[in-house]
Amino acid sequence: QKPKIFFTLHMGCVDILIFVLSELLSQIDVLYTPAKNKTLENKLFKIRQRQGGKMFPATPSGVKNLFRNFLNKNNVLIASDLVPHEKGVYEKFFDKECFCIDLVEKLSKKGTHDLHFIYLTKGEQKKYKVVCKKIKNKITTAEMNKYFEDAILTAPELYYWEYKKFRKLRPNKSNIY
């Protein structure tokens, strides 16, 4: 059985996905953005790793270590809807161009892992419902964004719009925020 790449977006509580995947898999590596408040970050880090997920900060060294584990056939979870600090590509998101993380595209091209889109939407009896879709093994960033759009349209109020997806535009475009 192949290891897995899970990509997700900030919709509902992403930490629930860490807990669910940690419960279902013997191992999961998670790329995340550390909280700016150090006290809060230390507590969140411990809670997230308690279930068995291994956390890697979205820094050059964190991505490098995650990639090393990826090459060793570890399972990976990436919330890939955030705006990258440096490396990325411009793609459409709800018909507007924005700067996007292309890590899932790069990892999926290796063909070593099964690819899944996992996210939370509104539940009927419970607050959230986990949705997991197996995807073809190679995906482009544009295709990934389309999956995000479809998920958001199921419950737009659950998406974390405050991450300002359109804040990093091409140099000749003005910031809309």
What are these model-derived regions, one by one?
Residues 3, 23, 27, 60-177:
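Non-catalytic C-terminal accessory region of glycerolipid acyltransferases
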Residues 2-60, 86-92, 96-98, 111:
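Catalytic core of membrane glycerolipid acyltransferases/transacylases, capturing the structured
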